[in-house]
């Protein structure tokens, strides 16, 4: 284990010495933790301490238990692009106005794939219709949905242009109010969104389904799913039917289908912290004077998720630079120590009365990180976590 993680355990361990918990850290991670514990003989942490340590970290991440993916996770490319965008990575796609608006009100993004065992609705002349059901029960009750969109992939169909056929067709998205019955072949629906799309490019088409998802989650109405209807022009029925990928091809493998299958994306806020934002690289602050080596300042601390065996459910990042504050707050306090008036007074009193403690070196500025992970239900989640990175230290 890297030295930084030892510091993390040393810094956080006093907060978790409150009792035992079920074993959560995988055996590999447990051995790495124990092997790195200072002293390592009689002083190394017990299984109960390690378990409680991880339990507290999971609670900080808003998880009740450690996710245990059953197989290699399928992460939609959309979520990887969204993570790169909000973590400020180079090469991230430019955000659209709609995405920026949705993310500006949310600190959590979740994705859902539909259940593929549903029946195909009766075919109508010139139209292809499918019923889609997305199980949203994994959304926490305290999470308020601010926006939701249904994404459908459209494949470039050059033959439509070669045959001089129309390369436009309409996609309609309906909410199912009442499902089909024995007496009625068609469900009762409500139109949510509609768009005229073209076949001259391969791209994702996004449709606003916020009203339906809010009714299901906030108002507790029954989720009967959606109907996706593709209206084909008479001269391009075959091409447009192949263009919009709302069902899996007969011989299509699982991996390729997972990259283009319909996707429901929800944007929500759990009432904690700030919404997602595009992280910009911070400019280094100019030092006003040469600091003493022992004075209060920020030190390196890298948290590697593989050291506790979490790399099987945390997709990105593999770790992050958390940093920590350490050092002396000597009298008199210099300007660069970013002190409060109270800290200045306390340090002054300490200089004449040693019973009064000195001011402490603590974080004065913290920033958030974005994490992409699989939750307990193997749903892909992008979440913004506040106060994870120390940006500045001072005497307080």
Swiss-Prot record:
Cellular component per GO, a single term: extracellular space
Protein name according to UniProt: Bone morphogenetic protein 2
Record-listed Phosphoserine modification sites: 87
Gene Ontology MF terms: cytokine activity; growth factor activity
Organism: Dama dama
Propeptide: 24-282
Assembly, per entry: Homodimer; disulfide-linked. Interacts with SOSTDC1. Interacts with GREM2, RGMA, RGMB and RGMC. Interacts with ASPN. Interacts with MAFP5. Interacts with FBN1 (via N-terminal domain) and FBN2. Interacts with type I receptor BMPR1A. Interacts with type II receptor BMPR2. Interacts with ERFE. Interacts with BMPR1A/ALK3; the interaction may induce HAMP expression. Interacts with TGFBR3.
Membrane-spanning residues: none
Record family assignment: Belongs to the TGF-beta family.
Record's subcellular location: Secreted
GO terms (BP aspect): cartilage development; cell differentiation; ossification; positive regulation of odontoblast differentiation
InterPro entries per record: BMP2_TGF_beta-like, Cystine-knot_cytokine, TGF-b_C, TGF-b_propeptide, TGF-beta-rel, TGFb_CS
Glycosylation, residue list: 135, 163-164, 200, 338
Assigned keywords, A-Z: Chondrogenesis, Cleavage on pair of basic residues, Cytokine, Developmental protein, Differentiation, Disulfide bond, Glycoprotein, Growth factor, Osteogenesis, Phosphoprotein, Secreted, Signal
Keyword Transmembrane: no
Main location: secreted
Region (Disordered): 272-293
Biased composition (Basic residues): 274-293
Cross-referenced Pfam families: TGF_beta (PF00019), TGFb_propeptide (PF00688)
Signal sequence residues: 1-23
Disulphide bonds in the chain: 296-361, 325-393, 329-395
Its job: Growth factor of the TGF-beta superfamily that plays essential roles in many developmental processes, including cardiogenesis, neurogenesis, and osteogenesis. Induces cartilage and bone formation. Initiates the canonical BMP signaling cascade by associating with type I receptor BMPR1A and type II receptor BMPR2. Once all three components are bound together in a complex at the cell surface, BMPR2 phosphorylates and activates BMPR1A. In turn, BMPR1A propagates signal by phosphorylating SMAD1/5/8 that travel to the nucleus and act as activators and repressors of transcription of target genes.
């Amino acid at each position: 284990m890297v030295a930084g993680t030892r510091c993390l355990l040393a810094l956080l361990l006093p907060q978790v010495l409150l009792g035992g918990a079920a074993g959560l850290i995988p055996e590999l991670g447990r051995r790495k933790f124990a092997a790195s514990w200072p002293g390592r003989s009689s002083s190394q942490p017990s299984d109960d301490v390690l378990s409680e340590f991880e339990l507290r970290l999971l609670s900080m991440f808003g998880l009740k238990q450690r996710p245990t993916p059953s197989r290699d996770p399928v992460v939609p490319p959309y979520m990887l692009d969204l993570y790169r965008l909000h973590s400020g990575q180079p090469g991230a796609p430019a955000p659209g106005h709609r995405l920026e608006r949705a993310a500006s009100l949310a600190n959590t993004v979740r994705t859902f794939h539909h259940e593929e065992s549903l029946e195909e609705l009766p075919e109508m002349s010139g139209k292809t219709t499918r019923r889609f059901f997305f199980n949203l029960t994994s959304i926490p009750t305290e999470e308020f949905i601010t926006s939701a969109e249904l994404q459908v992939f459209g494949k470039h169909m050059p033959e439509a242009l070669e045959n001089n056929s129309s390369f436009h067709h309409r996609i309609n998205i309906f909410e199912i109010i009442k499902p089909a019955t024995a007496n009625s072949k068609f469900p009762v629906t409500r139109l949510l969104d509609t768009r005229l799309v073209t076949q001259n490019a391969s791209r994702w088409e996004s449709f606003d389904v916020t009203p339906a998802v809010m009714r299901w989650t906030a108002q507790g109405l029954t989720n009967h799913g959606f109907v996706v209807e593709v209206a084909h022009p008479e001269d391009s029925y075959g091409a447009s039917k192949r263009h919009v990928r709302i069902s899996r091809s007969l011989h299509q493998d699982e991996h390729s289908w997972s990259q283009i299958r319909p996707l429901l994306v929800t944007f929500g806020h759990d009432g904690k912290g700030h919404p997602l934002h595009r992280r910009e690289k911070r400019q280094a602050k100019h030092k006003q004077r040469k600091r003493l080596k022992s004075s209060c300042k920020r030190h390196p601390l890298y948290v590697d998720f593989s050291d506790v065996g979490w790399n099987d459910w945390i997709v990105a990042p593999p770790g992050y630079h958390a940093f920590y504050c350490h050092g002396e707050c000597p009298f008199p306090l210099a300007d660069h120590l970013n002190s409060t008036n109270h800290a200045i007074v306390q340090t002054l009193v300490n200089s004449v009365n040693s019973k009064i403690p000195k001011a402490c070196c603590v974080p004065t500025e913290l920033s958030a990180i974005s994490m992409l992970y699989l939750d307990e239900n193997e749903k892909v989640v992008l979440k913004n976590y506040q106060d994870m990175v120390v940006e500045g230290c001072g005497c307080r």
